[in-house]
Amino acid sequence: MITHLNVTSIYVLDKDEALDFYVNKMGLEKGSDVKQGDYRWLTVRVPGDASTEISLETPGAPLHDEQTGEVMRGLVTKGAMGGLVFLTDDIHGLFETLKEQLLPSEALYP
């Protein structure tokens, strides 16, 4: 019987840039960071919640052939490869924090 989701994956173009974004902009914490040959298992998670981690995956080898990786990188660039939904106890405070850290005001108020 399935009891819990432990790991979910999102595709990113650059694992180090994604790690910086999720940790330093979104406030998540780094989970696992293990290198095995050419593959790097890198996860982030909500601070204090080690039960669910988000694996940051790059399209291409060793998970995909080059043609598939190229198609997937194009989809990631367009923002078409899924997303995440987080819960918060202060949506207005989170909005203000993200507005200051992530978005130029023109992006929110053209």
Regions found by a protein language model. Give the residues of each.
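Vicinal oxygen chelate
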Residues: 1-6, 29-110
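Short Gly/charged-rich anion-binding patches and loops
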Residues: 17-18, 93
